[in-house]
């Protein structure tokens, strides 16, 4: 195993390393966004080098980081980070609204995003949300909750990463792929509970276990009796 304790430079940001590695062969260490947030990990490069990453805890790997360079063979070990796409919600339009409208919209947007268990970072009048489901599903959530007046778009994660601090990058990208598939396409906040589509995926918990929810429905009548359908069994409740 080759121990990596320091980052030599960055081939995408540092002109010196760009010139030095102009004709070099890159042996890539490919990381997903969760792995990139770790200061310690062990993984093979694309050419089979066994690399042990042991960086200071405050150091976060970035796309293009040079971890090793053999001047004789002109081969460099370079980090390639595969980031998820990001939904960018532009809040600039809210500046022209009344304080009451601004507060109401921000509260309802936060509620809608939180109800999906989606991570988010707010910066520069924009909200960044990493994709954990299809863009069509995220688009549906935004429009169903009445936020079509807020411009939003989908961009590559690499476009957003330079705008973030290390802590913001960890919050936005660290473990985003572990977020539960938990999509609710429901009516706005003032609608009665139960009017809408709920799709639950697998939930992971810190205690080491996970569980899944089959598609289920809840119906509520006037005396608050309700029925549940859970996979292969049904039961009724009266209160």
Curated annotation (Swiss-Prot):
Gene Ontology BP terms: protein folding
Primary site of residence: cytoplasm
Recorded GO CC terms: cytoplasm
Keyword annotations of the record: Chaperone, Cytoplasm, Nickel, Nickel insertion
Annotated localization: Cytoplasm
Protein origin, superkingdom: Bacteria
Family to which the UniProt record says this protein belongs: Belongs to the UreE family.
Protein known as: Urease accessory protein UreE
Organism (species): Yersinia frederiksenii
